[in-house]
Each structure stands twice: as structure tokens, then as C-alpha cells.
């Protein structure tokens, strides 16, 4: 095996580990948000989710996982809008966000390609927040 090939394998291993951590951070924040929180705690959880989505997007780009990066871009945009006071999280939004996290996990494992229908749904929800 070439050094470049070994490096790429190691890079993907690191990506999977980091991706799992970022997904868990977003899931943890979403669960807390879904249970309800005061305004300060809600802002903290949205910020945490925004940062995790942003970091995961960059990591996905670094390992040429463009479909994961695309979903993360949608998540990041939604969390940015929420962070800036545009709209609130409702059942439909939570469902779509959880589905996106599940899809990212599947794509990390190479089990599934991106879902354009999910991306479209996230974009519609983002548009609704942006008003």
C-alpha cells in the first residue's frame, strides 16, 4: 500500500470518529430543545448545533464527502436562521433534522447516497424560517 493510500484510510477513520461526535452533539442538543428550554438554554443548544453542523460540513469536504457536506450546509443554514431569531422549531422541523442526522450516519458508512427529497424538504423548511 502506498503512503497516500494509508493516509487516506486514516483520514477517513478520523473523519468517521469526528462525524460521530458532531452528530451526537447535534442529537443531544435537539433532544434538549425538543423537551423545552428557557430562551438562554435554547440559544445555547442552537449555537452548539450550528457549530457542530459547520465543523462536520468542513470535515466532510476535506474527505470529499460532498453529499454529507450538502446536508450539513442545509442544517447549518437552518440553525443560523434559528440563532438569528427567524422562526421556531416545530414537530415538522424536528422530524426533518432527525432524519438528516440519520441520513448522515448512513452516508458515513457508505450505505446510502444523499437524498435529494430530504435536501429539498430542508430547503423548504429553511425558506419558511427565513420568511
Residues of each region from the PLM?
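Non-catalytic helical tethers at domain boundaries
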Residues: 1-131
Amino acid at each position: 500500500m502506498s503512503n497516500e493510500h494509508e493516509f487516506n484510510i486514516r483520514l477517513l477513520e478520523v473523519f468517521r470518529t469526528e462525524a460521530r461526535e458532531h452528530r451526537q452533539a447535534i442529537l443531544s442538543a435537539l433532544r434538549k430543545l425538543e423537551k423545552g428550554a428557557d430562551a438562554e438554554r435554547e440559544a445555547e443548544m442552537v449555537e452548539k448545533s450550528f457549530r457542530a453542523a459547520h465543523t462536520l460540513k468542513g470535515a466532510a469536504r476535506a474527505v470529499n464527502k460532498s453529499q454529507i457536506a450538502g446536508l450539513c450546509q442545509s442544517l447549518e443554514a437552518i440553525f443560523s436562521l434559528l440563532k438569528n431569531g427567524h422562526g421556531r422549531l416545530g414537530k415538522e422541523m424536528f422530524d426533518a433534522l432527525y432524519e438528516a442526522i440519520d441520513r448522515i450516519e448512513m452516508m458515513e458508512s457508505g450505505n446510502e447516497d444523499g437524498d435529494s427529497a430530504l435536501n429539498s424538504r430542508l430547503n423548504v423548511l429553511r425558506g419558511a424560517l427565513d420568511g
